[in-house]
């Protein structure tokens, strides 16, 4: 038999790129949330996170470490996505990972507006009340404070103001609306009642 020889094999290190993970995050409408992105690296290299594609229905703050703040667009609810990648200390670049955002709906209170109207003494006037609701809910109108020199009734979104007999000048009433869940602000309607000459009555 021959002598025994030794073969020395040198295995050179090859950088393994990090692996970025997909994420799912939920937040409420009009509520920002911090998203923590994640990745693994077998060599435990320091990792740098960067955004690849920004969301369509929200915005992202500046990436801080593995965190980024997602802010949904005003009154938006539904789904949104953005993507990110990770670079290790040896310039290895990960796959592109997707963050799927779910933005849950939150009821928005309706908003009313002040208004004005003019009518003649002893003459009722119809006034279209103004309110908006970003959720498109059905609205119910109601009087909050009645006028001091007349009366008011509401049918749908139309108020009928009737001045007291032989009164003139300025009068006000207030109203609000409800979407079935939330009440609006209270708005004021100012009514100007113009004087009308009353014919004399013979005794």
Question: Where do the model's predicted regions map?
Answer:
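Conserved structural position at the C-terminal beta-strand
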Residues: 86-88, 177-179
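Short, solvent-exposed loop/edge segments of extracellular or virion-exposed proteins
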Residues: 18-31, 52-56, 110-123, 144-148, ...
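Short, surface-exposed loop/turn segments at beta-strand-coil junctions that are enriched for proline
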Residues: 71-77, 162-168
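Proline-centered linker/hinge motifs at extracellular inter-domain junctions
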Residues: 15-19, 47, 58, 75, ...
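Short, solvent-exposed loop/turn segments enriched in Ser/Thr/Gly
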Residues: 31-36, 77-83, 123-128, 168-174
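C-terminal edge beta-strand
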Residues: 3-12, 24, 91-106, 116, ...
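Surface-exposed or secretory-pathway low-complexity segments enriched in glycine-proline
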Residues: 34-71, 103, 114, 124-162
